[in-house]
């Protein structure tokens, strides 16, 4: 598929901020520990751990830090009470939002998440209220490249779809459990991805205008500032014209 705006991404990421780097590392370490505790320390047989390792490396975490986190999870530690919680809700402009958390205190987490929705004109929904609009997928991203070559190699490696954006970027979609294998197969063909992650891909989009777009971005920022929030997914789409006004 072609003609998509990169603003259609399900997750908005601002330029890296040094002030948030420590918090990002803390969240990644928490996910590494939990993934290893639940599924074991072998990334080859633990897709969740493999995805966490990919994210850690993409954020320039050292192998030493990464391996220590995995060892903590395998050995058991005080993170044993952590559980994955998914909150669903509606953001500005009717945007469907899913918030993935790792928490040892549901009451604290839901209060922080609800506050973010309320402050930006949204509302926290019930389980299942928006989940049906999303599918869990692996996303392998190239900032640029030969579309035909990547598409041919990706489909041969077992990818489900390839999307080209207006700015020349290319995303390869896979079953989430197969993301690592497809990425490695592409690398073996000389096609090194710029990023690979597990994401929730929406089946429909909600167009944001000049009024709702900044509110949506504020909601995402508020949620990501919560210590317990690991990922924020949404179906908001901001056109290039609206983006230019932000």
Curated annotation (Swiss-Prot):
Alphabetical keyword list: Cytoplasm, DNA-binding, Transcription, Transcription regulation
Keyword Transcription regulation: yes
Molecular function via GO: DNA binding
InterPro entries with a match to the protein in the record: Integrase-like_N, TACO1_YebC-like_2nd/3rd_dom, TACO1_YebC_N, Transcrip_reg_TACO1-like, Transcrip_reg_TACO1-like_dom3, YebC-like
GO cellular component, one term: cytosol
SUPFAM superfamilies named among the record's database cross-references: YebC-like
Pfam family, one: Transcrip_reg
Subcellular location: Cytoplasm
Keyword Transcription regulation belongs to the record: yes
GO biological process, one term: regulation of DNA-templated transcription
Signal peptide limits: none
PANTHER family per record: TRANSCRIPTIONAL REGULATORY PROTEIN YEBC-RELATED (PTHR12532:SF6), TRANSLATIONAL ACTIVATOR OF CYTOCHROME C OXIDASE 1 (PTHR12532)
Similarity-based family: Belongs to the TACO1 family.
This protein's name: Probable transcriptional regulatory protein Ent638_2432
Classification lineage: Bacteria, Pseudomonadati, Pseudomonadota, Gammaproteobacteria, Enterobacterales
């Amino acid at each position: 598929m072609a003609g998509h705006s990169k603003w259609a991404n399900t997750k908005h990421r601002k330029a890296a901020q040094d002030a948030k780097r420590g918090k990002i590392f803390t969240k990644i370490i928490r996910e590494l520990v939990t993934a290893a505790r639940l599924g074991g320390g072998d990334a080859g047989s633990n897709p969740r751990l493999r995805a966490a390792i990919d994210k850690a490396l993409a954020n320039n975490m050292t192998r030493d830090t990464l391996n220590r986190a995995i060892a903590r999870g395998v050995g058991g530690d005080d993170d044993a009470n952590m559980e994955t919680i998914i909150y669903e809700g509606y953001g500005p402009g009717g945007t469907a939002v899913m918030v993935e958390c790792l928490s040892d205190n549901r009451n604290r987490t839901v209060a922080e998440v609800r506050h973010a929705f309320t402050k930006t004109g949204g509302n926290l929904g019930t389980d299942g209220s928006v989940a049906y609009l999303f599918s869990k997928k692996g996303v392998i991203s190239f900032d640029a490249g030969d579309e035909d070559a990547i598409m041919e190699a990706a489909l041969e490696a077992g990818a489900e779809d390839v999307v080209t954006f207006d700015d020349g970027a290319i995303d390869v979609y896979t079953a989430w459990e197969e993301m690592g294998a497809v990425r490695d197969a592409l690398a073996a063909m000389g096609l090194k991805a710029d990023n690979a992650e597990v994401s929730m891909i929406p089946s429909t989009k909600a167009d944001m205008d000049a009024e709702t777009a900044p509110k949506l971005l504020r909601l995402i920022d508020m949620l990501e500032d919560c210590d317990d929030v690991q990922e924020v997914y949404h179906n908001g789409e901001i056109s290039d014209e609206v983006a230019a006004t932000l």
